[in-house]
From Swiss-Prot:
This is Uncharacterized ABC transporter ATP-binding protein YadG. ATP binds at G38, P39, N40, G41, A42, G43, K44, S45. GO terms for molecular function: ATP binding; ATP hydrolysis activity. Belongs to the ABC transporter superfamily. InterPro entries: AAA+_ATPase (IPR003593), ABC_transporter-like_ATP-bd (IPR003439), ABC_transporter-like_CS (IPR017871), ABC_transporter_ATP-binding (IPR050763), P-loop_NTPase (IPR027417). Induction: Transcription is increased specifically in response to 2,4,6-trinitrotoluene (TNT) and its indicator compounds 1,3-DNB, 2,4-DNT, and 2,6-DNT. It comes from the Bacteria. GO terms for cellular component: plasma membrane. The lineage of its organism: Bacteria, Pseudomonadati, Pseudomonadota, Gammaproteobacteria, Enterobacterales.
Amino acid sequence: MTIALELQQLKKTYPGGVQALRGIDLQVEAGDFYALLGPNGAGKSTTIGIISSLVNKTSGRVSVFGYDLEKDVVNAKRQLGLVPQEFNFNPFETVQQIVVNQAGYYGVERKEAYIRSEKYLKQLDLWGKRNERARMLSGGMKRRLMIARALMHEPKLLILDEPTAGVDIELRRSMWGFLKDLNDKGTTIILTTHYLEEAEMLCRNIGIIQHGELVENTSMKALLAKLKSETFILDLAPKSPLPKLDGYQYRLVDTATLEVEVLREQGINSVFTQLSEQGIQVLSMRNKANRLEELFVSLVNEKQGDRA
């Protein structure tokens, strides 16, 4: 098993005694798509800042594909690509200049840099904008430019800090497709996001930071299994009779939409049986968004209660 990122007792105390990180231990395997979640002020940004050498740790150890970030910083940083939350490129350079110059910082030859720039700008639908100054791009295009720039030295580990913040739904889903494909081809990805649907759609494993501590580190599948219940939305055939369900919490959203809470031990089959017996046809069914968000809130509240 190859470890892409390892944090050992990572701590950060800011002036004034504010403890941002309280000893985080974490291993992310090579090839993983890992979500790092937590409320504002939990320590996510500090963790990302330390990994990317933008914030000095107080103590602990960080290694990237076995390279110690303190003792072998050059090799460690060659393995790592960062897409920060804030735009930090020269707005007066062209799109292609920005990504080609970034490759040069890592020793990529000029000819190869131009080859890579075409590859990534095309994949991210920016090739047609390659000669435009970055300041002329829309917010979504700037986000994609940040991803292209981070990939120019072809890192093994890509860290994305809120990569789809402010991006419309259609573009967000397009970026998800690109990131899934990148991960399928072998790039390890760590994602921080406030869009919990994004984490559920993309990530196989998840860590939750709260008050500078890693309070959860598990697979997405195992985390979702902790849900005590799920809420389903059922679309009913028009002019259906008024439904009545025994043993379930439910409500009619409108005359043709039924919302049902199903405990894990109950299952959904009895709902369909009861509705069928009443002559009610179910046209479609979906989960009420967002399952992960419900669980995230309950876990954070649970940990806050433990600290009280």
